[in-house]
């Protein structure tokens, strides 16, 4: 067996790789193992599996998203721990770039083999590799691997299932504390019985939690005051006493509400305390530092360590340490929406259900706020790592916003025309251009993105030539500029997308709507959005604030904030609507020319400032011009595929020419003129997913799709106008083949919520083939959700949503409060409290 396959088997035995990972599949290649290990996360977890707590996972970035800086940091943590705790010699270790750039993957396998033979690893009872009779000559298969590695690949989420989760540890402590003596469950429970159980659980767990806060104060804070300095006490206990005060009052009002008839006033208590629970913002943002400081003090002073053990013994017979108990408040505040969700599920009265939904929304919003504080703490740790590695940096990197992407590139400038190797860090507001010196970086230039724009340049690109893929970074005044070169076309696209996202964060759509001047802003206090009343989340740059009236808002809510300095804007909305209708009518009367998109455009370069929003274009889209001058390079138009209006470079389109009528009879799905009854006769005895497209007999210019789904035949009208075909207003196609091809790959549920299927089997295909053929382009997903609010992505890994969008849920195992989903072919993370799952009423 090849050495890399033996390594794979060993990693599976060490519970690092899932047994079903694609690297184990027939036909798997060594590059798939390299891709799985490149970010260093699994290697760090490997050491912890072999020797518990060998690495503090707080020092590891568990979601590096192929950031070269973070991946290399993880890899170097693995290598240093191999030496310090496993006794490997320096000569047995690979270099960090041997793995990240896959320069010598054979050396990586050699290091893992040496690790497998260490006494610590062998004590686990796992067979090391290679075995004595194994051949070692795998060198040929490792050559050229660096060209096969995909720097733009999405993370394989299943890979991280085995990684330890500190949140799960805190959850176990919480569940242990809240556990009550098991009460026999009646064999048959009514909905009323289940509701009573929910109410009882809410009260009992709140009593235990309040007792826990009291125990921390009584058995730890008071005794430790004589051992610790005031600043140590404040750092370790944060605002525990404030939490205790809030929950003492909350518990009293909770009991009063629960003792009332039917507990109908319970919802008011949660809504009232949402604002008071904002004190958790401070606690959750500082608890990690608190635990770290506690560990440091206990390690440095034996008397404190002994006192902590004594306190723990008195508080709970030594079951839980202070470190354990400090994790509980974070867990409790994240449980309220789950408790209320279950209560809503078993509440029958319509009015009560609606009221409880209000409380549920309030607690979901609070939970999302807490989760974002945790996420921003992780981001700030990442920024700190960047800061410590960059020399000549004269201000805090956090002032530039959140990191977008980092990596190697080549660069030319106005002053220096020859290509220079550089390492760049892109954040929301700035691009930092550095020269790498070993493990540190020397800052050469800081580009303020406020005054720059990006322009694509594909003129010199050749697919087979590295570092030929370039775009321009140009100052608005034209005095300064850079050419940025990337190794591959895919990397260039990834960087351009992140530049587009950064610029859209600085200059968001609707930033000047209703007379406002919205700018990115870091709020010191927890604040609610002026438009939707939901909380602005996180610890820095949580949203936007109007420079004039100081109104706070989410990015996605900017267009809905009342006019600057005025309270009511319903009249403005009405006027805008009437104006829009008049414009549409005028456009139709003029019969302006149509253009076909020949090159995609996603807002880079952005239109000149005075023009307006950009228009997103995809090849094949049809654009109806609204403003166009032959001598101007920027035109305005309406994309008939999306109905959006905006500006775009005129070189991205060409005149639209109606082609000759297509011969549809060549397609296996086309049935010609046919009534509904005829389609039903053909499809009734066929497999689910079998479909046909028919010409409607009553109107030969119209078409329809008939499809077998859930034992019934469904019919979908295809609307035709302006030479385009569509089954929903959201998306249009130039021809029927394009429409059919799209819905072969994308579920019809995006248009019709009860029709969760793709167009799978053309009716002219023999049934035998149709049964064996897997669904085309189907992605494994776990139900769907409907967006309740708009959401604007902040970076490339997030998914923008519009209210009413239907999202396929791919994963719920990411950072708390975030799910991974797919919509319109895009995949990314979105906040779970912005959606309603499976069209149910929260449950």
UniProtKB/Swiss-Prot annotation:
Where are the Phosphotyrosine modifications?
824, 842
Q: What's the protein called, per UniProt?
A: Proto-oncogene vav
Which intervals of the chain form a coiled coil? none
Keyword Magnesium on entry: no
Under the heading SMART domains, the entry gives: C1, CH, PH, RhoGEF, SH2, SH3
Record-annotated Calponin-homology (CH) domain positions:
1-119
Query: Which residue range or ranges hold the SH2 domain?
Result: 669-763
Domain annotation PH: ranges: 402-504
Gene (name only): Vav1
Q: Which BP terms in the Gene Ontology apply to this protein?
A: cell development; cell migration; G protein-coupled receptor signaling pathway; immune response; immune response-regulating cell surface receptor signaling pathway; integrin-mediated signaling pathway; intracellular signal transduction; natural killer cell activation
Q: Which UniProt keywords apply?
A: Guanine-nucleotide releasing factor, Metal-binding, Phosphoprotein, Proto-oncogene, Repeat, SH2 domain, SH3 domain, Zinc, Zinc-finger
What PROSITE patterns does this protein's entry cite? Answer: CH, DH_1, DH_2, PH_DOMAIN, SH2, SH3, ZF_DAG_PE_1, ZF_DAG_PE_2
One GO cellular component term of this record is: cytoplasm
CDD domains, sorted: C1_VAV1 (cd20867), CH_VAV1 (cd21262), PH_Vav (cd01223), RhoGEF (cd00160), SH2_Vav1 (cd10405), SH3_VAV1_1 (cd11979), SH3_VAV1_2 (cd11976)
The GO molecular function terms of this record are: guanyl-nucleotide exchange factor activity; phosphorylation-dependent protein binding; phosphotyrosine residue binding; zinc ion binding
Which comment does the entry carry about domains? The DH domain is involved in interaction with CCPG1.
Instruction: Summarize the PTM comment.
Output: Phosphorylated by FYN. Phosphorylated on tyrosine residues by HCK in response to IFNG and bacterial lipopolysaccharide (LPS).
UniProt domain SH3: residue ranges? 590-658, 780-840
- One family name in Pfam for this protein: C1_1
Give the boundaries of each Phorbol-ester/DAG-type zinc finger. Answer: 515-564
InterPro entries per UniProt: CAMSAP-like_CH_dom, CH_dom, CH_dom_sf, DBL_dom_sf, DH_dom, GDS_CDC24_CS, PE/DAG-bd, PH-like_dom_sf
- The DH domain covers which part of the protein? 194-373
Where are the disulfide bridges?
A: none
Q: How does it assemble?
A: Interacts with SHB. Interacts with APS, DOCK2, GRB2, GRB3, DOCK2, SLA, TEC and ZNF655/VIK. Interacts with SIAH2; without leading to its degradation. Associates with BLNK, PLCG1, GRB2 and NCK1 in a B-cell antigen receptor-dependent fashion. Interacts with CBLB; which inhibits tyrosine phosphorylation and down-regulates activity. May interact with CCPG1. Interacts with CLNK. Interacts with THEMIS2. Interacts with NEK3 and this interaction is prolactin-dependent. Interacts with ITK. Interacts with PTK2B/PYK2. Interacts with HCK. Interacts with PTK2B/PYK2. Interacts (via SH2 domain) with SYK.
């Amino acid at each position: 067996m090849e050495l890399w396959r033996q390594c794979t088997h060993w990693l599976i035995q060490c519970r690092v790789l899932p047994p079903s990972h694609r690297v184990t599949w027939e036909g798997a290649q060594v590059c798939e193992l390299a891709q799985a290990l490149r970010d260093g996360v699994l290697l760090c977890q490997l050491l912890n599996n072999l020797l518990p707590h060998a690495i503090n996972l707080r020092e590891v970035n568990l979601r590096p998203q192929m950031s070269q800086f973070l991946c290399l940091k993880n890899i170097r943590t693995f290598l240093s721990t191999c030496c310090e705790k496993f006794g490997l010699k320096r000569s047995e270790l690979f270099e960090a770039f041997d793995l990240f750039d896959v320069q010598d993957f054979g050396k990586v396998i050699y290091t893992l083999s040496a690790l497998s033979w260490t006494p610590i690893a062998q004590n686990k009872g796992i067979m090391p590799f290679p075995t004595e009779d194994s051949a070692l000559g795998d060198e040929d298969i490792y050559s050229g691997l660096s060209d096969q590695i995909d720097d733009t690949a999405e993370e394989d989420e299943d890979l991280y299932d085995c990684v330890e989760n500190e949140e799960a540890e805190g959850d176990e402590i919480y569940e242990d504390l809240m556990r009550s003596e098991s009460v026999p469950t009646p064999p048959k429970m009514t909905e009323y019985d289940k509701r009573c159980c929910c109410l009882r659980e809410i009260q009992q767990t709140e009593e235990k939690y309040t007792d826990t806060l009291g125990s921390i104060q009584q058995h730890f804070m008071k005794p430790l005051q004589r051992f610790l300095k005031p600043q140590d006490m404040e750092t370790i206990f944060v605002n525990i006493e404030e939490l205790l005060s809030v929950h003492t009052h909350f518990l009293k009002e909770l009991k009063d509400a629960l003792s009332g008839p039917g507990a109908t006033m319970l919802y008011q208590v949660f809504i009232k305390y949402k604002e008071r629970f904002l004190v958790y913002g401070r606690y959750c943002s500082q608890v990690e530092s608190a635990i770290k400081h506690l560990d440091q003090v206990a390690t440095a002073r034996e008397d404190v360590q002994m006192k902590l053990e004594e306190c723990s013994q008195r508080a709970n017979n030594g079951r839980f340490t202070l470190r354990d108990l400090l994790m509980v408040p974070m867990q409790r505040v994240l449980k309220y929406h789950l408790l209320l969700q279950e209560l809503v599920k078993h509440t029958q009265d319509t009015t009560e259900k609606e009221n409880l939904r209000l409380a549920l929304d309030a607690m979901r919003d609070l939970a999302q706020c807490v989760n974002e504080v945790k996420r921003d703490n992780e981001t700030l740790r990442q920024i700190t790592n960047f800061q410590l590695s960059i020399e000549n940096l004269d201000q805090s990197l956090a002032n530039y916003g959140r990191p977008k992407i980092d990596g190697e590139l080549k660069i030319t400038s106005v002053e220096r025309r020859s290509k220079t190797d550089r390492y760049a860090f892109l954040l929301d507001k700035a691009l930092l251009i550095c020269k790498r010196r070993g493990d540190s970086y020397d800052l050469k230039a800081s580009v303020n993105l406020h005054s720059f724009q990006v322009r694509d340049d594909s003129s010199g690109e050749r697919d087979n030539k590295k570092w030929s893929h370039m775009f321009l970074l140009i100052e608005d005044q034209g005095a300064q500029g850079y050419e940025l070169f990337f190794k591959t076309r895919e990397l260039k696209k990834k960087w351009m997308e992140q530049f587009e996202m950064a610029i859209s964060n600085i200059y968001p759509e609707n930033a000047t709507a209703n007379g406002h001047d919205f700018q990115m802003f870091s709020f010191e206090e927890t604040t609610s959005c002026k438009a939707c009343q939901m909380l602005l989340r996180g610890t820095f740059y949580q949203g936007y604030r109007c420079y004039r009236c100081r109104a706070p808002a989410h990015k996605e809510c900017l267009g809905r904030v009342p006019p600057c300095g005025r309270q009511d804007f319903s009249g403005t909305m009405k006027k805008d609507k009437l104006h829009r209708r008049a414009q549409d009518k005028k456009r139709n009367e003029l019969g302006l020319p149509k253009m076909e998109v020949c090159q995609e455009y996603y807002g880079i370069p952005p239109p000149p400032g005075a023009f307006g929003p950009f228009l997103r274009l995809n090849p094949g889209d049809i654009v109806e011009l609204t403003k166009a001058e032959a001598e101007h390079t920027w035109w305005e138009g309406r994309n008939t595929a999306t109905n959006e209006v905006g500006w775009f470079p005129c070189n991205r389109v060409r005149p639209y020419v109606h082609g000759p009528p297509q011969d549809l009879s060549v397609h296996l799905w086309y049935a010609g003129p046919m009534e509904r009854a005829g389609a039903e006769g053909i499809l009734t005895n066929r497999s689910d997913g079998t479909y046909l497209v028919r010409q409607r007999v009553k109107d030969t210019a119209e078409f329809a799709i008939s499809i077998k789904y859930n034992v019934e035949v469904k019919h979908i009208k295809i609307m035709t106008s302006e030479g385009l075909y569509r089954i929903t207003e959201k998306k249009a196609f130039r021809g029927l083949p394009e429409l059919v091809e799209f819905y072969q790959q994308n579920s019809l549920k995006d248009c019709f919520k009860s029709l969760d299927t793709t167009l799978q089997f053309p009716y002219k295909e023999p049934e035998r083939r149709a049964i064996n053929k897997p669904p085309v382009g189907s992605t494994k997903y776990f139900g769907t959700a409907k967006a309740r609010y708009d959401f604007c992505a902040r970076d490339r890994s997030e998914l923008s949503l519009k209210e009413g969008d239907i999202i396929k849920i791919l994963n719920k195992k990411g950072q708390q409060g975030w799910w991974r989903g797919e919509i319109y072919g895009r995949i990314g993370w979105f906040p779970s409290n912005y959606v309603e799952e499976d069209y149910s009423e929260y449950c």
